[in-house]
Amino acid sequence: MESLLKVMLLGSSGGIGRAFMNILAQNDISNSIIPHGTKLVLVDRCKDIVVSDQLKKKYAVSFISDVNISSHSDLEKLLIQHQINVLIEVADIETIEFVRVCTSLGVLYLNSGYGVWPDVYAREHPRCLMLVRALEIRNAIINRGAKSSTGVILGSGMNPGIVNALVERGIQRLANLNFIDKNELAADLKYIIFTEEDTTAIPTESKFNDSDFPITWNPQHAFAEFTEQSTGYVSQGRVQWINSRPLDCKFDVVCNDKVINGILVPHEEAVTIGEKYPNVTSGFIYSIPDITARHLPKVRNLKLINPVLLVPKNFELDGYDTVGVLLQTTRYGAYWLGYRNYHHEAAHYDTNATLMQVAAGVLAGTGILLRQFSRISVVEDLDHQIYLDTVCHILGPIVERQIMTDQLFHGFEHQRVGIIR
């Protein structure tokens, strides 16, 4: 079966795609996931797809450049023409139709996050696209435990992705600390809060134009999320809307060893975790880099944005990205677990810490997808131990800590509005 693999990487010239390819080429854990000699088809809309000699020596690499996929028929033709049986998609394109095409053709499919057709963000922004889209995808294609003609894993990046697996590990760890069954612990959960602190800085800050929007991951996607007309979280299995833009809605929450003040960003993982654990309140709080926050007020229109991806090829980066999850119960205390990665660690893969984290989730999901997987799933329904073992080979050990009472989350009623103007 391994020798018959023909893997397509869609979005190979983007930030995640490049990080993923460099991890494939350099990290030994990839050898047990995508074997040497596998046919690897790299696809992107740019004209020149650049890869390392290491990757070419390891895999039978071919290129399809200058490709624009704007409909389900475009994807279908591409998969059939090149006899693809595994699609790894990191291009931020339409999720629902991609799933339907892949399941109809029997192609294994994994993506790093929920996406829409390229013109949708610009057309519908600033409608509450992310949470609405996550609900649509959940209702259309996620049926927990249902068999499929082929395997599909949705949202296997960092968040969503690794953080979803951390929820399952954290529940077990906190249950063990309290000497109770994990189901009893899960029933007592009050909050599952995904937290991120990105301290990225440029030592000698470049002169950016007012239209520039610098950040460590997809700038268009990030800007769209931060400036939606409303934000929200999930409680009792339903989305609770807040009539405030994400960038104006801030909360204090613990993230590893400190309490951060971050913005409430609508995100996929809150929807699927909120469905699996309907008794909890779940959301994503993100402390964005200062350099990003300074440029948010300068660009008001998504169509006018000049995206600036902060990667070591173009900038000298300082700082780190910490991403994890806070599990807070009513009776059994609180627990935080996640990863902190510095940019200098990621430079080994010619990427930044944020994109290295996302690529680690892509590879971890791929490892499970290729193990005779035959259902449509999200990461919290996978074997979290196997998944996180792969992640740790790339990102290092998980940081875990019990949370003191003075660091507990106090709920989404305690918001700070109007911080970024």
Predicted feature residues:
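N-terminal Rossmann NAD(P)H-binding glycine-rich loop of SDR-like oxidoreductase domains
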Residues: 7-26
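Helix N-cap at the beta1-alpha1 junction of Rossmann-like dinucleotide-binding domains, i.e.
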Residues: 44-49
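A short helix->loop->beta-strand "cap" motif at the edges of active sites that frequently abuts
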Residues: 105-108, 146-150
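Rossmann-fold NAD(P)-binding glycine/threonine-rich loop
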Residues: 113-148
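Rossmann-fold cofactor-recognition segment
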Residues: 57-71
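Beta-loop-alpha module in the N-terminal Rossmann-like domain of NAD(P)-dependent dehydrogenases
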Residues: 73-74, 86-101, 117
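Conserved Rossmann-fold cofactor-binding substructure of NAD(P)-dependent oxidoreductases
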Residues: 69-80
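C-terminal catalytic/substrate-binding lobe primarily of soluble NAD(P)-dependent oxidoreductases
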Residues: 172-421
